[in-house]
Amino acid sequence: AIIEASYDGYSKIFGLVHRRLIMLAPDGGEIQGEDNLIGSGGHRYNLRFHLHPNVQATILQDKCSALLKPRRGAGWRFTCLDRAIALEESIYFDGSRTRRRTQQIVVFGPLGETGATVKWRLSRI
């Protein structure tokens, strides 16, 4: 399965369009993604992947991958190709509007003259 979406909400302020392509492997064991930030350079970007509070993330030694361990079920490995990642705090709002602390994976970097392309994947382990 392939999903493609774009968002132009940053175009007025930053002159930027965010396009995301997501591909699911037939067996469901891997998700590949590509984020294209299309626009002029001169800015930095942050791509944020917010995690559910029941998922604990740990950055691995290569600084480009994180181990994602849910309370139950199989773990996953998030890998960003050619980019370092970081973990930051986030907030999760459930259906009852209760706020819970959680984590987010952040991919960051500078925009080139025509934007940036970030490739990533989630692999079941």
Role assignments for model-derived ranges:
Residues 1-125:
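CBM-like, beta-strand-rich accessory domains located in the C-terminal region of large
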